[in-house]
Amino acid sequence: MSVVIRLARAGTKKRPVYHVVVADSRFPRDGRFIERLGYFNPLLPKDNEARLKLDMEKVKAWVAKGAQPSDRVSRFLDAAGVKKREARNNPQKAVPRKERKAQAEAAAKG
């Protein structure tokens, strides 16, 4: 059983609120979950304290048990200083594709 800490959408249409939950990765996004750890309200200003509310003791306990935070939750945990988020590395991003490389060579010759 792969356990993840992720966001489950709640709220009404065009007014989202997200619950931070611990769930099995096979469960639906807004469906069954094991435990609710807090909430996130993206409509509030970034400097508002009520924008993100987490029970840090529960979060630390679940991370210690091996729960993997989703990308967005890992950003929250990094900002709170709970778990360091490793930077993404994509060395192939700057390499031009074959078609672009051929076009550049043709333009250089022509």
UniProtKB/Swiss-Prot annotation:
Family: Belongs to the bacterial ribosomal protein bS16 family.
Top-level division of the source organism's lineage: Bacteria
Gene Ontology terms for molecular function: structural constituent of ribosome
Name of the protein in question: Small ribosomal subunit protein bS16
Region spans: Disordered: 79-110
Pfam families: Ribosomal_S16 (PF00886)
InterPro entries: Ribosomal_bS16, Ribosomal_bS16_dom_sf
